[in-house]
């Protein structure tokens, strides 16, 4: 919602000269919750004192944009356009808002600031249409009953287009000295979605708090993909293929949540929660594969259906040991039960009169999963201004899968859960330290030994022998104010260690190979990517931040330096290999408010990524970015200007020696019209025509370079108009020119 859930938005309905005092704080919605659940959910409250008492207000924003591409090579969205209207009504207890917007300038919101934003519009061509309606009603009575009802509906239609090209340069191996895998991917999709949400909450000091929430979504999506694959070994072409995908997907999702909070005594409270989540869908895919010749062509039609239902329940009991120092203990029990099925059939229609079943893409299975968790939590203050939370429990997950074509699967995973945290807060310093043990059971995709040949040269399969994995995470955060000049220094350290981490295991076949365990023949020069548990993964990330105000130029300067290290093991065939990645960085950020109407932001980032694996093959990339933003809110009373410049330089010292320079300049110039309630502006993106979307990264045994087509070079002429009315006990005009209605008051003010 524009208002209600976001209390800061309420200030948009008030004149700045009308506001006397603003007090912001967080409070518990239920007064008994305040007494019993000190760690419950809080809601932000704004108490605003005004000269006049606001009764209600309504406002509307009208937006219109028209423009064109500035790149003659870009055949998508040559005519750029946008049209939208936002209306909202605001009062103390009733809120109503509606939005309608259509554009192909890659904007997801019709907020005027977002539409006129000079930020990068992105490399994807996107055409969006959406409409939504939202309302909120609140009430309270003298007997202590208060509640809220919210309703929201939105319709969206999106069209996206992306074009990418990627190269994977492999390090020398047992089967080759040089290997290149190249993909050219063109993707277009159409997404139509309906989303609605209803929520109701009612609180009473005697009977507790009841909440209900319903969420319904319906999606109807279509996408088309064209994929060209090229393989090369020892500088000779080994294979190539061209694949076309047409996909139609329909999905329906509904979720119901119910919760109840109350107390037994002044020290004992409880919470009951329950939810059901139903998801079902239909999918129909058409796939044409052309490998090295027409004799290997396949024409697959693949219809599928799925349904999944999930029930969740949670019960919590809290006992206040000492109300004076907020010491409490809680007992939690949660259960999740999931059952579902998926049926998929595939036929090769290359010969329509004699269709053949495609075994690799035909399967049917059912799943039944049960997860239970018991946990005890203790909250206390061991020292002054220092709180401590300790929790420990046990989690049990039972996974079941029934499938005719392969062995059924049933396994139970039992693991502990542990969390310890300390938080210290003071006026000039604060710190926190935490340890948490996470556990992850493998999912159905990782466990099913079923071949996925969506890409015939990058085959994928699960592993039914996977173990559950554990993640030990450590966090330390410290902030301290230095001296009398409000300088602050902060330290952030994160570290994690993984046990039984599921990683990719890549096996390469230089000749056509039959895989008996998967009942599939892998084509020559293809790879099979499966999962395997591995030990030895760990990483550490650290950052030192210094902030200092520069009062002479009304500025704030931030300097931060960081270092990241990752120790990442994986498998190449049966050989365990490890990649070590070092990533030091240095950042500068300067925010200047030179005058009330002039703001300047300058930033720079330098970092170097050095990766090396067990075979001493390396990837080395240097990055340097710099940016500047200039915002002049008023020029000659009616005009304004915003500009954003961004420079990106990267150089690869590895296999391809790629050098990338990227200069992006976006500009927006406008003027106020119609008594300052309207805006006319011109926005232009990538004026220098030097934007390149390139990325290079080292993976297990290869370095991948990716180029993405850029659709963000265009200009628009924009018109925005604001209008509305405010009703209050004050006669006059607001600072945006809208007229206040006068309502006489009885008695003295």
State the predicted function of each range:
Residues 3-4, 8, 26-79, 93-749:
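Primarily recognizes Gram-negative and organellar outer-membrane beta-barrels
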Residues 14-15:
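Low-complexity, highly charged intrinsically disordered N-terminal segments
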Residues 18-25:
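Phosphoinositide-dependent membrane-docking surfaces
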Residues 82:
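Eukaryotic intrinsically disordered and solvent-exposed regulatory patches
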